[in-house]
């Protein structure tokens, strides 16, 4: 078995992340100096839409917005939880051409691999995309996992598809 991770840039609604058992690691942004978590698994779809509207309304009003990077320590913590649960890890990142998240996850994976992964694997896939194009990869991985595929089988199948996906905004 393996656990699937995405960052909140995948824009997976909480109900979809829960349905497909996908772990979402949230960005934390600053809006006019106030920390705002980008993902909350407890929000209803209506609350998620309202939170998104508030974010873009703040942007339109000229509020100072700073995006954050998910720390290597956060990735280590989340990946370690999966390893401790006797599972492999598969992470789909926001494009490394947009964010440093892939590198943070890579450093975390290297740190964990240098110690003890209990024989489990950590696979990282740069989606080379953003938004739901990133999330769709995780949904496909979930379906493959449910069919009994290993982390390597799922990752090896999905990684070549990265270059064939386009995000439309």
List each model region and its residues:
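N-terminal glycine-rich anion-binding loop in soluble enzyme alpha/beta folds
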Residues: 3-74
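A short helix-to-beta-strand connector/capping loop
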Residues: 19-21, 118-121
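Glycine-rich phosphate/diphosphate-binding loops that line cofactor/substrate pockets in enzymes
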Residues: 76-89
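Short glycine-rich or small-residue beta-strand-to-loop segments that form or flank ligand, phosphate
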Residues: 88-96, 123-126, 140
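Short Gly/Thr/Asp-enriched flexible loops that form oxyanion-binding sites at enzyme active sites
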Residues: 94-115, 136-138
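Short helix-capping segments at alpha-helix termini
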Residues: 111-120, 147
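Glycine-rich phosphate-binding/hydrolytic loop that grips phosphoryl groups
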Residues: 128-146
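Internal, active-site/partner-interface "lid" segment
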Residues: 142-169
